[in-house]
Amino acid sequence: SFSGATTLMIAHGLTSSMYFCLANSNYERTHNRTMLLSRGLQILLPLTAFWWLTASLTNLALPPTINLLGELFVITTSFSWSHITIVLTGLNMLITALYSLHMFITVQRGTLTHHMINMKPPFTRENMLMFMHLAPIILLSLNPNIILGFTS
């Protein structure tokens, strides 16, 4: 359905943008793009770990986020269109969930590497940026008619 696609695009745009901001924040501190070399950041940056967890759970379409509403609309529409799409969509959701959790666990958990001992804490602007990504997701989750009203 058009409303499901629109809802999912807006939710995906906010969640993906939050992921990219978090990845850039990690890169600015570690000067490294390899997830295995950036492990254990939860010990040094607990608030950043919270933002990673929030982005991961939002990406998993955790209820009651707007991501879940969009995915439910798209899944029900595609299932009524063709039964084979439900298998492909389910597989896609499983792979996305596994990768999101793998990325969170790899970056946040584990033992610290030796080059990350002297790391700067997150700036207020970075925390505000993450909040500015999360606020629309929460507001749209509380009142999805903001999106659905335009598409129905």
UniProtKB/Swiss-Prot annotation:
GO cellular component, one term: mitochondrial membrane
Protein EC: 7.1.1.2
Source domain of life: Eukaryota
Gene Ontology terms: biological process: ATP synthesis coupled electron transport; electron transport coupled proton transport
Enzyme class name: translocase
Keywords noted in UniProt: Electron transport, Membrane, Mitochondrion, NAD, Respiratory chain, Translocase, Transmembrane, Transmembrane helix, Transport, Ubiquinone
Stretches that traverse the bilayer: 2-22, 43-63, 84-104, 128-148
Role: Core subunit of the mitochondrial membrane respiratory chain NADH dehydrogenase (Complex I) that is believed to belong to the minimal assembly required for catalysis. Complex I functions in the transfer of electrons from NADH to the respiratory chain. The immediate electron acceptor for the enzyme is believed to be ubiquinone.
Protein name: NADH-ubiquinone oxidoreductase chain 4
Record gene name: MT-ND4
